Amino acid sequence: MADYLISGGTSYVPDDGLTAQQLFNCGDGLTYNDFLILPGYIDFTADQVDLTSALTKKITLKTPLVSSPMDTVTEAGMAIAMALTGGIGFIHHNCTPEFQANEVRKVKKYEQGFITDPVVLSPRDRVRDVFEAKARHGFCGIPITDTGRMGSHLVGIISSRDIDFLKEEEHDRLLGEIMTKREDLVVAPAGITLKEANEILQRSKKGKLPIVNENDELVAIIARTDLKKNRDYPLASKDAKKQLLCGAAIGTHEDDKYRLDLLSQAGVDVVVLDSSQGNSIFQINMIKYIKEKYPSIQVIGGNVVTAAQAKNLIDAGVDALRVGMGSGSICITQEVLACGRPQATAVYKVSEYARRFGVPVIADGGIQNVGHIAKALALGASTVMMGSLLAATTEAPGEYFFSDGIRLKKYRGMGSLDAMDKHLSSQNRYFSEADKIKVAQGVSGAVQDKGSIHKFVPYLIAGIQHSCQDIGAKSLTQVRAMMYSGELKFEKRTSSAQVEGGVHSLHSYEKRLF
């Protein structure tokens, strides 16, 4: 910090605060509320802060935010919203393998560059087939080829405008009678770049642009809606095919290999091995199996809270580590099993070890506010996984209900008896599938409505950027570098200091965050 002194009157600056090493090597287990980060020098605006972070060895996100694979947090709607806002969502596995794979497929199909496997119909199909496709896939701009398959002669396209006002008795009409014919279509030649194709699509004012080869056979299609999504969501997390990134959770049992096969077919980018205690022979064997059979899929191991746990998973070949045990708002593992670790200490200790091997860390659990996110990232985590913070958003699974005039959504731990009763996957996560008596490691509850992810996540992003600005770092990479070098200083908080740091001495107040 002394490098940034601008007053010329004195050069003496007393040593102030503790380094991360001093703070966490005292033997105490610390949570995020037990310390603060001391401010630095500001010479830039908050919007200049770069939040780019590594999720795994090969996947980088523009924002360090991840949604937890819980059945009251992440299904396709949440995963799409998280990816559009720069993060990623992990589809839970407290469901059938087919349902989970279909949720992944929804995310991957939501936005694409060149769509090489679109829904295709033939002129002999009927209007009702279009409505069925629309109900199943959410769209009805469907190319028509002579055989109803990709790679055959393009003869037309069917859009919502062609069928909007058809009466129910007309649903048996052949598509060849009502489709927009080939001679009225705007098409682009195979080999065109995505940028050039998008320019043609813009000029044409059409909803879809078929891509055809020299024989007028359909080879791909691009959609106008994807152009609008590119404009509206510049931070979106995408793969090489311009599809949204999507993760999914799996277990470590033999039948999870079938689940993995379906997820791979659906296009999943990364899987997290979902276990409350990841340092097991079952997880080590599963990591090796995935890396051998599906080397392109990134694997996140966990959960771990010590360097010794992390070592075994790193040696097995994980691409990232998930850190946290018993720190979640609905988790009672520490209380029931007497195992776990305060989250701030766990994040620092595992991150400090894993960085030597280039393995990113995901801080999972204990996040109550945007300040906790900033602290987790400052302690070495590359990304932060959130459950309760994202529960009860519009995109979270479940229906809203009212209690005492407050709009709520259900939220439960995957170790709760409620979740274990729903599907075997929750029992597997806690090694309880063979137990006659279940030991709950989580609870069920309710969380107040937070509105849409598209408003809430931008608030979190702005909060992290302002935190980095106060620290004096223009990127999260710089924050971590300052922490490991000892330049970033911390200070422990007494219980009185924590009270002082919150709202106090008011008769009444309204706490609006965004």
Curated annotation (Swiss-Prot):
Protein task: Catalyzes the conversion of inosine 5'-phosphate (IMP) to xanthosine 5'-phosphate (XMP), the first committed and rate-limiting step in the de novo synthesis of guanine nucleotides, and therefore plays an important role in the regulation of cell growth. Could also have a single-stranded nucleic acid-binding activity and could play a role in RNA and/or DNA metabolism. It may also have a role in the development of malignancy and the growth progression of some tumors.
Linked residues for Glycyl lysine isopeptide (Lys-Gly) (interchain with G-Cter in SUMO2): K195, K208, K438
A Pfam family recorded for this sequence: CBS
GO MF entries: DNA binding; IMP dehydrogenase activity; metal ion binding; nucleotide binding; RNA binding
Keyword tags: Acetylation, CBS domain, Cytoplasm, DNA-binding, GMP biosynthesis, Isopeptide bond, Metal-binding, NAD, Nucleus, Oxidoreductase, Phosphoprotein, Potassium, Purine biosynthesis, Repeat, RNA-binding, Ubl conjugation
Source species of the chain: Bos taurus
Name of this protein: Inosine-5'-monophosphate dehydrogenase 2
CDD domains, alphabetized: CBS_pair_IMPDH, IMPDH
Cofactor (UniProt): K(+)
Chain positions recorded as K(+) binding sites: G326, G328, C331, E500, G501, G502
Entries under PROSITE patterns matching the protein: CBS, IMP_DH_GMP_RED
SUPFAM superfamilies in the record: Inosine monophosphate dehydrogenase (IMPDH) (SSF51412)
Protein residues bound to NAD(+): D274, S275, S276, G324, M325, G326
